[in-house]
Amino acid sequence: MARIAGVDLPRDKQIVIALTYIFGIGNTTAVKVLADAGVPTDVRTRDLTPDQEDKIRAALDTVKVEGDLRREVSLNIKRLQEIGSYRGMRHRRGLPVRGQNTKNNARTRKGKKVSIAGKKK
């Protein structure tokens, strides 16, 4: 099992799909990384040579992935909260950030509905 960027990649998948298991790598980025490394996209992970793995690791060094990316995202959210922006307030209150309505929906962000005793009459 190839271990790249601290993630164990599945052996039986094509490398272009296996790279998407790394946080911060989608399909487009995976194709670009493989093109930079000179590795064909249809190769299975188990068939990679150690030289190809090293080339992929070198190409991934230019991309921000895993822990660095998670840290940057959390710092961005923290910065929005500290400056008191509208988006920061929505993050702090656990409400949708991007303008969705909350009168009826937004259950994913708001959590399970809490009934209020004595409301129905």
UniProtKB/Swiss-Prot annotation:
Keywords: Ribonucleoprotein, Ribosomal protein, RNA-binding, rRNA-binding, tRNA-binding. Residues 89-121 are annotated as: Disordered. It comes from Latilactobacillus sakei subsp. sakei (strain 23K) (Lactobacillus sakei subsp. sakei). GO terms for biological process: translation. InterPro entries: Rbsml_uS13_C, Ribosomal_uS13, Ribosomal_uS13-like_H2TH, Ribosomal_uS13_bac-type, Ribosomal_uS13_CS. Belongs to the universal ribosomal protein uS13 family. One of its GO terms (cellular component) is small ribosomal subunit. Located at the top of the head of the 30S subunit, it contacts several helices of the 16S rRNA. In the 70S ribosome it contacts the 23S rRNA (bridge B1a) and protein L5 of the 50S subunit (bridge B1b), connecting the 2 subunits; these bridges are implicated in subunit movement. Contacts the tRNAs in the A and P-sites. Part of the 30S ribosomal subunit. Forms a loose heterodimer with protein S19. Forms two bridges to the 50S subunit in the 70S ribosome. It holds the Pfam family Ribosomal_S13. This is Small ribosomal subunit protein uS13.
